[in-house]
């Protein structure tokens, strides 16, 4: 195909977009349709060329949408107060946004999905400052208890623990309020962390909107610890807290788990199948012995409920894809293995109701952010595809 032909096709496509915009505007005005339909009429894409380099002055992926126009809103949560090893994830959203302009605006599973609008909110500076301050306090506390010192013998450490736990309560309410507000406006919502403690308020807002649902957790860790290191809402406790506080979270299905404690294993065994865990070692053994990934994913999908939220901790991947992750563990998935599973979930007729992407860390280069941006792109396209207007 020659250059002139491609230009003509692109021009025809933009003319088509203008016609669609005018048509939906007329229909919406005439029939007083729900505001969600205005998503398709508020952004004029006739001057946007998805085939050229991404414009860093635009929003995520170089897309030209505003929050009002976009159907899917990504909420950044810059929080890493309780991380117990490497830090850097509080600033992941900024780095992922920069890296995202390198992605081609096309998804083979949903070629037109981006036209519904993806928008990343600006990072809340107050929340980031709060995270930075409490992180310094938490580091002192973690160092203190790691040496076998007793917290009850030190008034300063008792106050530090109290401050961190109060900060986590503040975070949970902040996330819940933000997500609930967006859902009430008819938006699809995703969360971009930040550490894995961040989505509890998100889960609670989803539970109110969708009633019974399940979480598919991609992770190297179970995150089923109770009061880890004394922190009520540690990144290592997110799924424990979700199960304790959200009654209509019916199923937690974990895959890729390869670093866990005996107490967490006991919680799984005593959960009456509310927690279903596919350990990384067991998956690998089944593959080594001749089973296919198709067979394993068929089984996984069949055990999920109708409504599914994906909680994606980046350390669920092979560490070569996320070398700066806060708690890296050898093993893990290739990205395409997970994309295959996610696509199969949608093809089964199940509904993806949301997702979070967490623990992407900032390194010396932008490799982690690049990988994170590509995972985010795929998840955004899957979410809008699973929720047609």
Regions found by a protein language model. Name each.
Residues 5, 25-30:
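Ala/Thr-enriched low-complexity intrinsically disordered regions
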Residues 7-8, 21, 39:
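Polybasic, lysine-rich low-complexity intrinsically disordered segments
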Residues 16-19, 29, 228:
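Repetitive helical segments and hydrophobic/amphipathic motifs
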Residues 18, 41-43:
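Long, low-complexity, intrinsically disordered N-terminal extensions of eukaryotic proteins, enriched
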Residues 24, 33-38:
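Short hydrophobic targeting helices and cationic amphipathic motifs
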Residues 43-389:
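Conserved alpha-helical scaffold segments that buttress catalytic/binding sites
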